[in-house]
Swiss-Prot record:
It is found in: Vacuole. Disulfide bonds join 23-85, 97-105, 223-236. The keyword Chaperone does not apply. One of its GO terms (molecular function) is chitin binding. Keywords: Carbohydrate metabolism, Chitin degradation, Chitin-binding, Disulfide bond, Glycosidase, Hydrolase, Plant defense, Polysaccharide degradation, Vacuole. CDD domains: chitinase_GH19. This is Endochitinase. It holds the Pfam family Glyco_hydro_19. Its EC number is 3.2.1.14.
Length: 243
């Protein structure tokens, strides 16, 4: 299991300031909840060589730390020690409700970002809830109140391919082979493609930007703590977003 790679003390070192009094999520993201959620996704962090497993865990925690960061450039212990500080999206610009016959929004509910990967939009809450057997369309706040479920939503997004896109898990474990179109678009296996999968439309193919650099900073720190190389193709500065 993943606890062989990430012990409780390692989790606490990686997410060093998550329980800081200044963090709105203090007390929410626990090691036990992380392990409990991972049991529902048994291939997460357990596929391939030890290095591949370490890299997947560093990548998951790196991307989720960026999504929930409370860091700033001169923060104590550096900006990359402040992952998992936030639970809900700050100042959501809308209720993230798109017209959808299959995943209609519930009256009065808002599908702004919640949890480690900041699950957003009714068309993500819907299928995620179906997969986890919870009515997340009707109860989106469960992602911000149920610790284990919150981690499960992040792991669901990480592990589940959304065709024609691969899953983050398949990219990291080598199951994804880029097509000719992927290669032409600069999408090669590595951490950069994960950023493309998670937020490519806003962050990729635009040259260097602070969001991608922040995602990378967390990943580098966590790879260092786990004693594993980062691999290649780390950013998506020159990748076209997935369609």
């Amino acid at each position: 299991g993943i606890e062989k790679i990430i012990s409780r003390s390692m989790f606490d070192q990686m997410l060093k300031h998550r329980n800081n009094p200044a963090c709105p999520a203090k007390g929410f993201y626990t090691y036990d909840a992380f392990l409990a959620a991972a049991k529902s996704f048994p291939s997460f962090g357990t596929t391939g060589s030890t290095d591949v497993r370490k890299r997947e865990l560093a990548a998951f925690l790196g991307q989720t730390s960026h999504e929930t960061t409370g860091g700033w450039p001169s923060a104590p212990d550096g900006p990359y020690a402040w992952g998992y500080c936030f639970l809900k999206e700050r100042n959501p610009s809308s209720n993230y409700c798109a017209p959808s016959p299959r995943y209609p929004c519930a009256p009065g509910k808002s599908y702004y970002g919640r949890g480690p990967l900041q699950l957003s939009w009714n068309y993500n809450y819907g299928p995620c809830g179906e997969a986890l057997r919870v009515n997340l369309l009707g109860n989106p706040d469960l992602v911000a109140t149920d610790r284990v479920l919150s981690f499960k939503t992040a792991l669901w997004f990480w592990m589940t391919p959304q065709a024609p896109k691969p899953s983050c898990h398949d990219v990291l474990t080598g199951r994804w082979q880029p097509s000719a179109a992927d290669t032409a678009a600069g999408r090669l296996p590595g951490y950069g493609v994960l950023t493309n999968l998670l937020n490519g439309g806003l962050e990729c193919g635009k040259g260097p930007n602070p969001q991608v650099a922040d995602r990378l900073g967390f990943f580098r720190r966590y790879c260092g703590l786990l004693g594993v190389g980062t691999g290649n193709n780390l950013d998506c500065y020159n990748q076209r977003p997935f369609g």
